[in-house]
Amino acid sequence: MMILWIMGKAYLSKEIRDVCINFDRRIKEIKSICKPDIALPKGTLILPGAIDLHTHIRGLKLAYKEDVVSGTSEASYGGITLIGDMPNSVPFVNTMETITAKLREFEYYSRVDYFVYSGVTKDLKKVDKFPIAGYKIFPEDLEKEETLEVLKSMKLKILHPEVPLALRGNRKLRLNIWYEIGALYYVKGYQNVHITHATNIRTVRLAKELGFTVDITPHHLLVDREKECLTKVNPPIRDTNERLWLLQAINEVDTVVSDHAPHASFEKQQPYEICPPGIAALSFTVPFILTLVSKGIISIDRAVELISTNPARILNIPYGEIKENNYANFTIIQFKDWRYSTKYSKVIETPLDGFPLRASIYMTIIQGKVGSLEGEVFPVKGINPFGENK
């Protein structure tokens, strides 16, 4: 593989400085002077490649909602260089056969690096040996016997925090915040547990108190209640007061995820009571977090922790920092004004459309190759860092 030099302002060792980075698939050397193969324009900043722990790329029999090419292209467009895919596709991904099918689909078509989660499984001994990142525990799983065995796995366990009772009866039950908070006690005492898409500051603080890592989503911060199917999501959007409190948690959570959950337009146009929940804005997260930096709400140090360093630490993989021997994945950004819209996803309408942002993605580099440049995505081949195809 060709070894390249890139020169520009970069964030490394908690400093922004002018550097030259030498890389192929991994970072080889960092120094101050070089003859660059890629010279970046003024106003750009090289960050460690951004990571999204929670997406639903769909594919398989749900490819009409989103497929691997469209979903991972949207990721690269939005500065995400590594994504984690949830198992609730069709077929459900929790057996050797379905995991193999999902991994094969990503291996052939993914335009960013990727990893997958298994659902709770009765075949834990075999599934645990597969190149997966861990397990997703849904509310209905908290009543299953096999979940107790999954919780003992050394791999990462990601919990959707709602008690099983929240699934029964009227949707208004889900608006009870204690149904979310109570779910954390089901997994109390277990190791390597991550709480995803917390919707209120109580959940965040309890998660930290119990020794878990935790994330939030941009839409739980920004979207104003559930008014129609476009804003319907699980766990539900909270009221304005709760969302303002949740914004305070931006300095307490470990990472921010998209929970990209695409559905076809005809599905989201169904009546609110029966339409599927989910907001699909995979490319929003990184520009939004960097917009918070531009506005002085968080520091650049905190931003890099949220989108790169902390998710890599949670996964225990060589990403998230610009240092020798880490994978050569970079998110290169510019601070400039624009209004959000999706570009490559099959979802063309989100409740975040038109949101004013102050940061955009100039380029992504994935496995040492240019994955996107000024909005145009290229067909690079992503890898599974948990797999054999490193």
Swiss-Prot record:
Its cofactor is Zn(2+). Pathway: Pyrimidine metabolism; UMP biosynthesis via de novo pathway; (S)-dihydroorotate from bicarbonate: step 3/3. The active site is at 259. Signal peptide: none annotated. InterPro entries: Amidohydro-rel, DHOase, DHOase/Allantoinase_Hydrolase, Dihydroorotase_CS, Metal-dep_hydrolase_composite, Metal_Hydrolase. Keywords: Hydrolase, Metal-binding, Pyrimidine biosynthesis, Zinc. SUPFAM superfamilies: Composite domain of metallo-dependent hydrolases (SSF51338), Metallo-dependent hydrolases (SSF51556). It catalyses: (S)-dihydroorotate + H2O = N-carbamoyl-L-aspartate + H(+). Zn(2+) 1 binds at residues 54, 56, 136, 259. Pfam families: Amidohydro_1. The keyword Cell membrane does not apply. Zn(2+) 2 binds at residues 136, 160, 197. Binds 2 Zn(2+) ions per subunit. One of its GO terms (cellular component) is cytoplasm. Its EC number is 3.5.2.3. Catalyzes the reversible cyclization of carbamoyl aspartate to dihydroorotate. PANTHER family: ALLANTOINASE. Belongs to the metallo-dependent hydrolases superfamily. DHOase family. Class I DHOase subfamily. NCBIfam families: PRK00369.1. This is Dihydroorotase. The lineage of its organism: Archaea, Thermoproteota, Thermoprotei, Sulfolobales, Sulfolobaceae.
